Swiss-Prot record:
Keywords: Cytoplasm, Gluconeogenesis, Glycolysis, Isomerase
InterPro entries xref list: G6P_Isomerase, G6P_Isomerase_C, Phosphoglucose_isomerase_CS, SIS_dom_sf, SIS_PGI_1, SIS_PGI_2
Cysteines engaged in disulfide bonds, as pairs: none
The EC number(s) this enzyme carries: 5.3.1.9
Domain of life per record: Bacteria
UniProt signal peptide: none
Gene label: pgi
Protein name: Glucose-6-phosphate isomerase
Subcellular location as annotated: Cytoplasm
The protein's annotated pathway: Carbohydrate biosynthesis; gluconeogenesis; Carbohydrate degradation; glycolysis; D-glyceraldehyde 3-phosphate and glycerone phosphate from D-glucose: step 2/4
GO biological process per UniProt: gluconeogenesis; glucose 6-phosphate metabolic process; glycolytic process
Chief location category: cytoplasm
Active site, renumbered: 350 (proton donor), 381, 503
Species the sequence originates in: Burkholderia mallei (strain ATCC 23344)
Role: Catalyzes the reversible isomerization of glucose-6-phosphate to fructose-6-phosphate.
């Protein structure tokens, strides 16, 4: 299947030509925006969240055509196959059953294994949180260091930061991912080996960055007085390769299992989320799962016309494949969601940044947009200038939490006002005539600089309060959005072959950086010159 061969495609192209120059300002004008208002028609709810799509460049006809696109592309069939545990990752011959990790239904796949592993996690988390699990000198654990990269880092770090307000104050959680030694060194400055628990997270337990950091941390423990025989009090491992964990030196009883039917970027619901469970406790971890389950149920059962992940995915395709948007921005007006944009970068671009279709042919249309973002209001003082007055179209997801999770309640109206005002300003803009009035007769030359084109599309997601449950629903919303877009683009969102070539060449380059001699013909002239400079700096 090619995207532009679907029966609905010519109708969508014609519709795009018809409305591409229409301005959102006119659609919201009182003469056109009669009951039910545009906001009422384009606001939908599901999984405890609300989404206002009304400030997007679409009409009722647009949505009808996009929903038809979803049906013709087989979105429903792909969704149902994923939930059923079918092989939806054909290049690796695997299912993608992250939804089974939160299913809580006896007929869902792998429920016995999932329940047993979660119970083991809960026992361990309770022991650490209560002080029953101690370090080698008998002191309780005060620091947890999660060592992992990609999905073994981004998801847990994002959730622990987001739910800080419900986390235990007795344990600080640190995350180390980068192979740059500075990342680990800065954490080592803040922790005490007698009070530190290390969680090493790697699906294969061979990941270069993770194992380099794990070995350095193990050496640090021993160098700072921990007997090698007591390391079991300070190291646990999470992996789909338990034998390799034991080979590293972690006690078999301290191994938590993940499975190859869960992709790394979808794995925070598994034992990969052990650092989350220690921080917020097993009961709140269950609430996180329940929120994701709420969105799973909404995704499975809501009509496509009112289905939040479906609509979010289709709106993204509308801008990517018709308006030619190269990127889209995620702007959470919540400091608690500081790491959500970086988490979504991996979720969206590692999943859908593909050029090969499932059938092996190459696409002739754009796939994943560049995903980026920063919390509000910080972003307003960095890149919103470009969003308002630059020539580039950047669709935006605003995320607003309506009630604060902190005691400084007087700040919150200011935060929400900025979020809502930005969406309004991006939609309305300011005409040249309006700008001339502001510039006045004394400075008419200023008017062009005071104009705003407006017509910049935004979606606003509303969360009543940031709780484990609503956070779980928000994360699952984006997970399912990715699947919807992958189905329409006919690509596999569950593999990541694009990360492999650099890894392979990285091992060759690393060997050349320390080798006695290097054959300059082994690499291109640029890479050879870079290696030569680095060897000189390293004293080789």
């Amino acid at each position: 299947m090619t995207l532009n061969s679907l029966p609905v495609w010519p109708a969508l192209q014609a519709h795009y030509e018809e409305i591409r120059d229409a301005h959102l300002r006119d659609w919201f004008a009182p003469a056109n925006d009669r009951a039910p208002t545009r906001a009422e028609r384009f606001t939908f709810e599901g999984g405890g969240l609300a989404a206002d799509f009304s400030k997007n460049r679409l009409t009722d006809a647009t949505l009808a055509l996009l929903v038809r696109l979803a049906r013709e592309a087989g979105v429903e069939a792909r969704r149902d196959a994923m939930f059923a545990g079918e092989t939806v990752n054909p290049t690796e011959g695997r299912a993608a059953l992250h939804t089974a990790l939160r299913a809580n239904a006896p007929d869902a796949p792998f429920q016995a294994q999932v329940a047993a592993e979660r119970a083991k996690m809960a026992r361990f988390a309770d022991a650490v949180r209560s002080g029953a699990w101690t370090g080698y000198t008998g002191k309780r654990i005060r620091h947890v260091v999660n060592i992992g990269i990609g999905g073994s880092d981004l998801g847990p770090k994002m959730v622990v930061h987001a739910l800080h307000h419900v986390a235990t104050p007795d344990i600080a959680t640190h995350f180390v991912s980068n192979v740059d030694g500075a990342d680990l060194a800065r954490v080592l400055e803040r922790i005490d080996p007698e009070e530190t628990l290390a969680i090493i997270v790697s699906k294969t337990f061979t990941t270069l960055e993770t194992m380099t950091n794990a070995r350095s941390l193990r050496d640090w423990f021993v160098a700072n007085g921990c007997p090698e025989g007591a390391l079991a009090k300070h190291f646990v491992g999470v992996s789909a390769n338990p034998a390799e964990v034991v080979k590293f030196g972690i006690a078999e009883a301290n191994v938590f299992e993940m499975w190859d039917w869960v992709g790394g970027r979808y794995s925070l619901w598994s034992a990969v989320g052990l650092s989350i469970m220690i921080a917020i406790g097993p009961e709140r971890f269950d609430e996180l799962l329940a929120g994701a389950r709420d969105m799973d149920e909404h995704f499975r059962t809501a009509p496509l016309e009112r289905n939040l992940p479906v609509l979010q995915g289709l709106v993204g395709i509308w801008y990517r494949n018709f308006f030619g948007a190269q990127s889209y921005l995620v702007a959470p007006y919540s400091e608690a969601l500081h790491y959500l944009p970086s988490y979504l970068q991996q979720l969206e671009m590692e999943s859908n940044g593909k050029s090969a279709r499932i059938d092996g042919a190459f696409v002739d249309y754009p796939t994943s947009a560049v995903t980026w973002g920063e919390p509000g209001t910080n972003g307003q003082h960095a890149f919103f200038q470009m969003l308002h007055q630059g020539p580039t179209l950047v669709p935006i997801d605003f995320i607003a939490v309506l009630t604060p999770e902190h005691p400084l309640a007087s700040h919150h109206p200011k935060l929400l006002a900025n979020c809502f005002a930005q969406s309004e300003a991006l939609m309305l803009g300011r005409t040249l005539d309006e700008a001339r009035k502001i510039a006045g007769p004394a400075k008419p030359e200023l008017a062009p600089h005071l104009t705003f084109p407006g017509n910049r599309p935004t979606t606003t997601l509303l969360v009543d309060a940031l709780t484990p449950r609503t956070l779980g629903a928000l994360i699952a919303l984006y997970e399912h959005k990715v699947l919807v877009q992958a189905a329409v683009w006919n690509i596999n969102p569950f593999d990541q072959w694009g990360v492999e070539l650099g890894k392979i060449l990285g091992k060759v380059v690393e060997a050349d950086l320390t080798a006695a001699q290097v054959d300059p013909a082994k690499h291109d002239s640029s890479t050879s010159a870079l290696i030569a400079r680095a060897r000189k700096a390293l004293g080789e």
